[in-house]
Amino acid sequence: MSDAARPLDPDEAARRLGPWLGAGGQAGGVVLAVSGGPDSTALMGCAAALPPRVPVLVATVDHGLRPESGEEAAGVAALAGRLGLPHRILTWRGEKPRTRLQEAARAARYDLLLGLAREAGAGAILTAHTLDDQAETVLMRLCAGSGPAGLAGIAPARRLGGLLLGRPFLDLPKARLVATCAAAGWPFAVDPGNAAARFARARLRRVMPLLAAEGLTPARLARLAARLRRNEAALAAAAEAARPSLAAAPAGPGRLALDAAGLAALPEAVALRVLADAIAALRAGERRPERLERLEEALFGRILPAIAAGTPLRLTLGGALLDLAGGRLLLAPEPPRRRTKRAG
Ligand SMILES: Nc1ncnc2c1ncn2[C@@H]1O[C@H](COP(=O)(O)OP(=O)(O)OP(=O)(O)O)[C@@H](O)[C@H]1O
């Protein structure tokens, strides 16, 4: 059997899940997010086989978006019962948006899982994201023009609402999880959305074999994500360390000021990060971060050349008004747009 499609053996499963679920794992136990697909079914099966372990609660979110979703959730409940694990179905109620439905479904899913984990006193939520998910995410973000932060992909572990969100299978090929289910006789569902060409992820999945033939394998894309995650941490630290040397006279409440010469003296990647962070701090929570490509155009195409030439500059970027004058780059929230008066 090829290594890429070998079922997980109990030792390997224990090594991966032990830190989360083992005797010394998460105090209060964990919630397993199980959709009923092969990846999360394998997560549930492997967790059930792990002795001894902290309390485990399995949760399936029924988004109510496909006619068969209720049946799938019931299928997970049945298998959880067979495996001796408690199971809950969480239903996404309320208005479903017409646009960005997948994004809204994901946000609702994490909210529901978090609510359950808090109610159960669990310390962590585990999902079954795989190396294939990671590779697809990186590819999708590459297509969308993401920078290092986006290309760092799915985090192996991160904080979520005061709890931990873990992905213990993130470096495992999906084929191994499918093989694990098959070998153990755990039934799983196949999401038709996975093949629907109207979703970008599904379209990219079809391109994957072509890219792999050229050397851009899922494993390589996943390694790129891990590498960029390390670089991203270094960049964040460098931007943080540069901040004191950039402090310029405060520009009034709700405003920021950066020393222009100091900004220009930084390595370009650090300067870009400082600018992005400053705009994000100014517009906290009010809008989505500006596209990296626009930030790059503004910084490298206009702001740094103006600093070098000593010329003043005004521009709006990411909801902020930037004003370069007197050796300072002032940032203020962009004023509400005025209607242009129609002549005559
Ligand atoms: N309906 C669901 N109920 C419970 N868990 C789910 C559900 N859908 C997905 N998950 C969890 O999320 C993991 C990833 O699923 P999938 O790739 O379909 O979601 P995604 O939308 O890409 O998720 P993410 O936004 O977290 O990347 C699954 O392995 C599972 O652990």
UniProtKB/Swiss-Prot annotation:
Q: Which reaction does it catalyse?
A: cytidine(34) in tRNA(Ile2) + L-lysine + ATP = lysidine(34) in tRNA(Ile2) + AMP + diphosphate + H(+)
Location relative to the cell: Cytoplasm
- Please indicate if the UniProt record lists Ligase as a keyword: yes
UniProt GO MF annotations: ATP binding; tRNA(Ile)-lysidine synthase activity
Pfam families referenced in this protein's UniProt entry, alphabetically? ATP_bind_3
Q: Which residues bind ATP?
A: 35-40
**CDD domains per UniProt:** TilS_N
Q: Does the keyword Ligase apply?
A: yes
Write out the entry's keywords from A to Z: ATP-binding, Cytoplasm, Ligase, Nucleotide-binding, tRNA processing
Broad class of where this protein is predominantly found = cytoplasm
The protein's role, per its UniProt record: Ligates lysine onto the cytidine present at position 34 of the AUA codon-specific tRNA(Ile) that contains the anticodon CAU, in an ATP-dependent manner. Cytidine is converted to lysidine, thus changing the amino acid specificity of the tRNA from methionine to isoleucine.
Q: What is known of its domains?
A: The N-terminal region contains the highly conserved SGGXDS motif, predicted to be a P-loop motif involved in ATP binding.
Which family does the UniProt entry place this protein in? Belongs to the tRNA(Ile)-lysidine synthase family.
Question: What name appears for this protein in its UniProt entry?
Answer: tRNA(Ile)-lysidine synthase
